[in-house]
Amino acid sequence: MFDIGASELLVLVIVAIVVIGPKDLPLALRTAGRWVAKMRRVSNHFRAGIETMIREAEMEEMERKWKEQNERIMRETAAQETAAAQGQTPAAAEDQNDPFPTPLAADAPHTDPVMTGPMPPEAKVEARVEEAPAARPGSQQP
């Protein structure tokens, strides 16, 4: 970062020993280390803020491009639908744009008719005949 070579660092150490003295040198180095750490934290925080702003600007640009592309696609699709609808009858074009189409009888599920009233007398007789087991000749029924 500061591009300090080995010889320059040696000169700084000798000057620090002479000026500060060997007794107070550890305290001075600790204080200098704290200041360097604070400067690094501030610069990292500043860098992170700048990078966040850049990312947000890029996201806004991408969202703007996506919105423009979406609008272009919607216009092209609408133009194709109107071109296709011109060859249809007005009723068919209206049915195409109906958001809730009327269901057709063919779309309904198939069910058998259900009788809701009392059974006719001939149906009762047939039901009894089907329920009764077939009697075998020579065997008794309980």
From Swiss-Prot:
Keywords: Cell inner membrane, Cell membrane, Membrane, Protein transport, Translocation, Transmembrane, Transmembrane helix, Transport
Job description of the protein: Part of the twin-arginine translocation (Tat) system that transports large folded proteins containing a characteristic twin-arginine motif in their signal peptide across membranes. Together with TatC, TatB is part of a receptor directly interacting with Tat signal peptides. TatB may form an oligomeric binding site that transiently accommodates folded Tat precursor proteins before their translocation.
Composition-biased stretches (Basic and acidic residues): 123-133
Keyword Lipid biosynthesis tagged: no
Record membrane topology: Single-pass membrane protein
Lineage: Bacteria, Pseudomonadati, Pseudomonadota, Alphaproteobacteria, Sphingomonadales
Quaternary assembly: The Tat system comprises two distinct complexes: a TatABC complex, containing multiple copies of TatA, TatB and TatC subunits, and a separate TatA complex, containing only TatA subunits. Substrates initially bind to the TatABC complex, which probably triggers association of the separate TatA complex to form the active translocon.
Record-linked InterPro entries: TatB (IPR018448)
Record's protein name: Sec-independent protein translocase protein TatB
Similarity comment text for this entry: Belongs to the TatB family.
Spans annotated as Disordered: 75-142
TM region positions: 1-21
Gene of this entry: tatB
